[in-house]
Amino acid sequence: MVLMMESQCEYFMYFPAVPISDLSDPAKYRTLPRRSHLYLGETVRFLLVLRSQSASGSSDGSCGSEQHSSRSWRELAGSLSAVASVSPGDSRQRTQPLYHDYHSSGDECVEDTDEDDAAEAVGCPGRGGPRYRGFRECKPLLIHNNPGNGVREFRRAPVQSPVDEPVVLSDEVIFPLTVSLDKLPVNTLKVKIIVTVWKQEEEKAEIQEHGYLSILQQKSPCQTFRQDLNTFKAQVSTTLNVLPPPTVKCQQMTVSGRHLTVLKVLNGSSQEEVCVRDVKILPNFNASYLPMMPDGSVLLVDNVCHQSGEVAMASFYRMDSESSHLPSMLSALEEQNFLFQLQLNNQPQDDSNEGLEVPLVAVLQWSTSKLPFTNSIYTHYSLPSIRLDRPRFIMTASCPSAVRTRENFRVRYTLLNNLQDFLAVRLVWTPEGRGQKEDPAVNAVVCHSPLSNLGYCRKGSTLSVSVAFQILRAGLFELSQHMKLKLQFTASVSNPPPDARPLSRKNSPSSPAVRDILDRHQASLSLGRSQSFSHQQPSKFHLTRTGSVMERRAITPPVGSPVGRPLYLPPDRNILSLDKIAKRECKVLVLDSHN
């Protein structure tokens, strides 16, 4: 009977959408609503039902035959065991990719640059690469569910959940089973749930004494497992669709020296309401390690911060507001923005990890009403990394909050130098931008001292200068953006190659830009090996780092210059870093004098 029992049973898998409190009555669980899809990361509770065809078919026979069949079925059903496993059914890429990979690169960082912003605490690597405005989609890294809401919770709350032990009825046996979908790839589209059913029997004394290895070495496998051929063994499987977690997009920006991160959570895959319980941004120091080597050793990434005192687990503070309270319910295609501000810990300069990348990860805790056996799901997303680049040379400005039109007032500019010694520091008022249209608002500002020479500036010192202004019309005006910094500092100039042609005005081209470069280079050599740095706020059209721009011009060889004798210019290795210098905005409100 046992030999053919597998084929004499019907197998059913039920995925109830609500908890089950009683399995004694088959009519109850058969009429419960069933789930048509699952969520990646949840714990799935389902039922496997084995229904005996012979037990139901023997009711037309004699009473003795029916009792014998029922007794045999109960003996067999009581000795059966079942275990469930899960595997990806389909992990191919979706038609419209939901995730895009941005792994710790400079292009990951999203800065919506604004001419009034100044870089203060953090920056982005790879400033020479392309810039992207708006939100960028973040890739899920890891998905897991609440560990305190697993099988143990079913035992603690038997009233709301099915029992763990199999239930044997007159013609069927019910196995309550559990599988977790938190060990699957993040791009899984379908899952295959496999259940193996077998009859548990005690091992022979010979096997318990010697073990299978010794017996297989002495006997043939067919002889050893001959009796196991009559043991009940069956395997059933089903495939279900899997919905991905909510979509998370990220935008990073720096406003007035404060680093802000906006996370956009979108319910773009489920027609059910998604409850966002918590959102966090944490440093991901696990990204500092490379994959394990064959010998078991682990290497560190050089440019990635392995531990940081500045960026701690609580450094990203979520700014709560009326529109972003938690928990938050998101309907289908509904999104919610969450604003985070980076709060760095004060660290000595020697202990600072400045210049190193700090990988970030976002942790989203969410759930739906269709998760009857999972309290919540935690999804980890990869965020663009940040780099600790505090400016060491800062220009601040202060002025009256409000003045009248055509009224003379003064703006006090203060320079805080913690960068290096400078031979000369000058402030130049440059309202016109290079190659840009004139701004009528800027033309209304009259600077009475467009050039201020502050002289030598030692590292650790503070310089101040007062500049007189007059504004001709009413409005709100910014007085730091167009105040250009000119810094002169010593620089080591390497020896020119022997075949390099010296720079001279005799063979210089007629291009004014080239001649200006040559003149400034000759002047720098005569001033004791110094270089000049011009710091100018970028316009909105420049997709460059907020707060600093270096002017670079190409030098064209003169017409008719000898082939193979290039122009020699000193390398730019000593050019100041753009992230080390910043300017703070200063705005004044101009009121109409007639009012």
From Swiss-Prot:
It comes from the Eukaryota. Its main location: cytoplasm. GO terms for biological process: cilium assembly; regulation of cell population proliferation. Pfam families: TRAPP14_C (PF23652), TRAPP14_N (PF15806). The keyword Cytoplasm applies. One of its GO terms (cellular component) is midbody. InterPro entries: TRAPP14_C (IPR055452), TRAPP14_N (IPR055453), TRAPPC14 (IPR031626). Residues 84-111, 494-513 are annotated as: Disordered. GO terms for molecular function: alpha-tubulin binding. Component of the multisubunit TRAPP II complex, which includes at least TRAPPC1, TRAPPC2, TRAPPC2L, TRAPPC3, TRAPPC4, TRAPPC5, TRAPPC6A/B, TRAPPC9, TRAPPC10 and TRAPPC14. TRAPPC9, TRAPPC10 and TRAPPC14 are specific subunits of the TRAPP II complex. Interacts with alpha-tubulin during mitosis. Specific subunit of the TRAPP (transport protein particle) II complex, a highly conserved vesicle tethering complex that functions in late Golgi trafficking as a membrane tether. TRAPP II complex also has GEF activity toward RAB1A. TRAPPC14 is required for ciliogenesis. This is Trafficking protein particle complex subunit 14. The gene is trappc14.
